């Protein structure tokens, strides 16, 4: 929040027997998106879980960035009257994940793009 993205770490938990081609496809998509966002993937970790212990693959990422000098960021600094910029439907991503992971018996066409936002917000970050 409020930082120029620079680095990304990732950890994979991969189910035994997960297709290597699918893993390569995921890694290639991560590489492409990182390049588009101007971010370097600098660290990674993999663990293999037994068949049936995970649903295919779980990926956890951590992003690190640069905060412009003299700028303070943090949710605790929010106050009444501040502007909040929303880049999509509130709750869409969480709803998408829940529908993909759980069997609620609901048929809904809900997707989440998880797109990098730096290109859209960097004008706000750059000094005048």
Stretch-by-stretch model annotation:
Residues 1-128:
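Helix-biased detector of long, well-ordered alpha-helical tracts
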